[in-house]
Amino acid sequence: MERFVLKFLLIDKVIAVCLDQKISNERLNPLTEYFFWPQRDAWEDMKNFIDNNDWIDPKDAVNILNRITEVINFWEESAQLKKEDIKNLNIKFPDCVFIVM
């Protein structure tokens, strides 16, 4: 997943995810809007986006969807994450960006 970055917004009882493409070490190109969970199925929304963009390598697609599953499961098991928990999230998922609202 070195060509992509998943960004997660943590908002009370909602988690949102979007996908960015790395252009360089410092620049990102947004590819999707934020997909929200549990109001909608963020995983399914991301899968639909990936399926409609055949330039995304299948291996990257699997890694992206697996990472979303891991983060959502961690978030659900943790009940309510606080700003202090960002450090733990960054350690557990160093390839993602987390923003607590």
From Swiss-Prot:
> Could you tell me where this protein is found in the cell?
Plastid, Chloroplast
Q: Which Gene Ontology CC terms are recorded?
A: chloroplast; ribonucleoprotein complex; ribosome
One GO term in the molecular function aspect is: structural constituent of ribosome
Q: Name one GO biological process term.
A: translation
The UniProt keywords, alphabetically, are:
Chloroplast, Plastid, Ribonucleoprotein, Ribosomal protein
Q: Which domain of life is it from?
A: Eukaryota
Gene3D superfamilies the UniProt entry points to: 3.30.390.140
Specify whether Nucleotide-binding is a keyword of the entry: no
- What's this protein's family per the entry? Belongs to the chloroplast-specific ribosomal protein cS23 family.
PANTHER family listed in its UniProt record = 30S RIBOSOMAL PROTEIN 3, CHLOROPLASTIC, OS04G0461100 PROTEIN
Q: What does this protein do?
A: Probably a ribosomal protein or a ribosome-associated protein.
Q: How does it assemble?
A: Part of the 30S ribosomal subunit.
**By what name is this protein known?**
Small ribosomal subunit protein cS23
Species the sequence originates in: Euglena mutabilis
